[in-house]
Amino acid sequence: MFKRTALILRRCFQPTFIRPHHINVLENFKEADDLPNQGQAKFVDVSIHDPQHIRSALVSPMQRKFLQDLEQQQTVRIKWFKEGNQDELENMKNECRRLALEIIMAAKGGDIKKACKELAEKEKCKQIELKKKCKELEKKTKCAKKDPCKKKDPCKKKDPCKKKDPCKKKDPCKKKDPCKKKDPCKKKDPCKKKGGDLKKKCKKLAEKEKCKKLAKKEKMKKLQKKCKKMAQKEKCKKMAKKDKCKKK
């Protein structure tokens, strides 16, 4: 029950267990939280001076056992400070707090309920802070890490009703870059000349040729009709001559 308490109780106890002594134990909780930094090489003097004199004054065997545990934990504490095992030290602090509360409750001294409530509130506050930090880290990791294998949906189609703005105009204030050089290897489009677009001209010429062909066809048809009429007239004349000759 009284093991691992050297981190909190840095001073020797009074010869007998009395109520003011247990109240002083609660004051030492605050000092236990103020641990030295890892970079500091100095260690707190936790040695128990003249333990034989104190043991002779203590009558209870539980008190003697408590001092023996302090002597044993003195060497362990120094080793932990040298090695820098902070996680184990924090676990030791929590256990020592629990043991000190048990000592106070056993001695029936001090306001136990208030001390228990304060410790419970501190632990709750620490847990709430840890949860907040964890949530913030999760959000940061989600934003930082995106799925590289995620691709766009190939089945996603463009809106067919979406049209370009026909009134979109060029910037009249936009100027050409004087330092920009022309590409000497770039060839001009033969269909684009100063005289205009050749494609349009070709279309016009083709239409004209079609019109000419149609006109020729119409002329030929008219000539054919005339020729037929002339041939019929000649036939009629010949027939009339033959009839006259027969009558004579």
UniProtKB/Swiss-Prot annotation:
One of its GO terms (cellular component) is mitochondrial derivative. It comes from the Eukaryota. Its main location: nucleus. The keyword ATP-binding does not apply. Residues 82-147, 197-244 form a coiled coil. Residues 146-200 are annotated as: Disordered. It is found in: Nucleus; Mitochondrion. Residues 147-194 are annotated as: 8 X 6 AA tandem repeat of D-P-C-K-K-K. The keyword Coiled coil applies. Sequence repeats lie at residues 147-152, 153-158, 159-164, 165-170, 171-176, 177-182, 183-188, 189-194. Keywords: Coiled coil, Mitochondrion, Nucleus, Repeat. GO terms for biological process: sperm individualization; spermatogenesis. Expression limited to post-meiotic male germ cells. Expressed in elongated spermatids during individualization and in finally elongated nuclei of spermatids. After completion of nuclear shaping it is no longer expressed in the sperm heads with the onset of individualization. May be involved in the final steps of mitochondrial differentiation within the flagellum. This is Sperm-specific protein Don juan. It comes from Drosophila melanogaster. The gene is dj.
